[in-house]
Amino acid sequence: MEDNYKTIMEYYNGSSETSVKNYLENISYNNFHLYNLFPQINDSTFIPIELSITEDDANNSNYDSIIISDVLKKYPNVSGTIDYDNDGIVDNLTIILRNKADNAGSNSSLVSHKSDYPGGNDITLSNKSLGTYNMLNTYSIRNTKSSVIIHEFMHSLGYPDLYNSNNDYPVFTWDIMGNVISPPPYPLAYLRSYFTNWLSIDEITKSGTITLNTQDNKDGNQAYIIKSPLNDYEFFVVEYRKKPTLFDKIDRSISNSGVIVYRINTTITGLSNKFGSYGVYVYRDNSFALNSTPSSAVYNTVFSKELGRTTVGNSDLNSKDKALLYSDGTNSGIVLSEIGSSSSNSITLNVSIPNKGDLDVWNELKYDDINKNSGYKVQTSIEMNNKIYVGSITNNKLYTTVYDNGNWSTISNGTNIVIGDVSPSTMEFKIINN
């Protein structure tokens, strides 16, 4: 068990940038500090706890409550602080189960996971209630080193899974929550801002030139939010990722240095990708192509002058080819161009965003012209009291509608009228007693 002790201690508290403690300090710009307690240590050796269940049991079913009960009966008290926010609940409990192979059944205790203890106050640690816990296993730690420990602990901080069961790799190696790979990558900048407030990201709504800095620059522009006027609930984020030359470094597992762009869908609960819809999706060649291969998700997602990939997006709103699409398949019209060199710690690019004044306002307001197929019609509109009134005459019938509080409603639906020579310039629209 002495070798296990050295290995586990290195993964948690080691000097490497990718140890759990140092990783969290790096990605948070020293805003978050993790203090680990190991109550089973005796003379640089871990003293194992024998459980009341077998490895086969834990392979096939969820025995978390029994495992936790067995552990805390053995160690009901620990020395050191376990409740830094003083809410009466243990900040986080981690249990590592020993196993010989990766053959655990779905949702069993031997699948590495984060959960919340359901038992309330029926069991305590140093008189503190249990809440969030991580259940890990030696097989996954042996294969991914600190990465699986980090992944599950990030869940404890509120971060979602960014992978799914459809094998379309929505984020993959661009975030530790998208793929448990060693060495671990950074979490995406937007998630570090949204879930833990470790950085702030400026929002862009007008065309211009921007400069992005590397993720390790706490005072730089790690990312920008880019919004098009075409969608109030979805937007795109660009960030610059720099692949280090040394192996045991954060982001060593990404494919290349350069700019990535990803879509955020704020209508998805917790921004999770796990349940079929995508809160976060990284752009790749041929737009946001589903069912892409792992290599496509790795190599076709990054842009720089060195890679010969310097443009992203399509300004033709009627085209989807290589466009930055919303989740419903419509084109945002956003274009990133003249993406620069990734040779330094910053990169420059141009951003083009559709001008709201140039868009089809009727399409934006979802106006449904019931006479749109008529060969001859006269139509006019007027705005009054924050309402839009539309009058349309075709085949000696008058149709009037009103737009109010985001909805269209009918005033008259085909009233018979007698007209002579009517043109748009002679049709007069009056609102009386409104």
Listing of model-derived features with the role each one plays in the protein:
Residues 1-9:
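Fold-level signature of zinc-dependent metallopeptidase catalytic domains
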Residues 21-26, 92-94, 98-253, 265-267:
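Extracellular hydrolytic enzyme modules, especially secreted metalloproteases
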